Amino acid sequence: MSLTVDALTETLVQVRQKQPVVHVITNWVTAGDVAGTLHAVGARPIMAFALEEVNDIVSGANALVLNLGTPDPSRIKAMLQAGRRANSLGRPVIFDPVGVGASRFRAEAAERILSDLRIAIIRGNRAEIGALAGMGGELRGIDTATAPPDLLAAAGTLSLRTEAVVAVTGPQDLVVSGGKAVIVENGHPMMSQVTGMGCRLTALIGAFAAVETDLIAATVGAIAFFGLAGEQAALRAEGPGTFKAAFLDAIYSLTPAEFQRGLKLTEQKIR
C-alpha cells in the first residue's frame, strides 16, 4: 500500500493524462451528474445499461461501476453480465449498494452481485455497509443513517468476506483493506445537502482505480480529492444550488499542488 502524498497525487495526474473510460451502470436520478463529474476530472464516462451491448461497452472500458440506486430486474441482469465480462478482462469493478437496507429486492440483488462477481471496491454510507456486513444500522432514507454499532468492525468484516476494499463515507470517511484502515477527513457539510454526491464519488473512485492498481490508494486518493473539491466549492457557494455548480468547477480545476497541501489522512491498524 503506497499512501504517500506524492503517490496519491500522481494518481490524479494519471487520471487527467490517460483519460480512462469508465463504464457506469448507474441510476436515472443521478446519471447526468455522475457523467459530468467524470468528464470534469478528465475521465471519459459511458452510461450504457442495455443487456444487448454491455459486453461490448465493458470491453472498451478501463473500469466498471455498478450502482444500485434505481434497480429493476433488467438492470440487475445487465450489471451481472457486465461484471462477468469485466472480471474476465481483469477490469476493476466498483459497487455502490445504494439503499441496500430499504427493500428485500435491493438486498437480494446486492448479495447476488457480491457472490457472483469479483468486486474490487465497495463504497457506501454507514447504514449500507452495516447492512451488507450483517451488522445492522437504521436506515433513515438513502443518504442519512445511523452508524452500525462498530463501524470499523463492519467494514473489516465485509472486506474480509468479499476481499474488496471497503469505503464507508459520511462526515468522516473510512477506507478498510487487508487489516489496515485509513481515515479521510476532507470534505464539507454542504456536500450532504446535494443529491447524488455518493453516486458521483463512487464513479470517481472508478476513474482512479482505472489508472492505479493499488486499490486502497486509488480509493483513498479519490475520496480525498472529492472532499477537497467540496471544501473549495463551499468557499464560493451560497446554498446547495450554487454549491453544485461550484463543486463541478472544483473537480475540473483543483490542482495537484492544492491536492498535496490539503490532504487529511490518518492510517491505523484493525485490531
Language model regions located:
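Acidic-glycine-rich active-site phosphate/pyrophosphate-binding loop
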Residues: 4-15, 164-186, 258-260
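Short, small-residue alpha-helix embedded
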Residues: 131, 195-224
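Active-site cofactor/substrate anionic-group-binding motifs, chiefly glycine-
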Residues: 37-90, 95
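Glycine/small-residue-rich loop that forms an oxyanion/phosphate-binding "nest" at active or ligand-binding sites
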Residues: 75-124
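Conserved phosphate/ATP/ADP-binding segment of small-molecule kinases
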Residues: 106-181
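Short pre-catalytic strand/loop immediately N-terminal to key active-site residues, enriched for Gly-Thr
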Residues: 156, 184-195
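Glycine-rich phosphate/adenosyl-contacting loop at the front of the ribokinase-like
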Residues: 1-44
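Charged C-terminal helix
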Residues: 6, 228-271
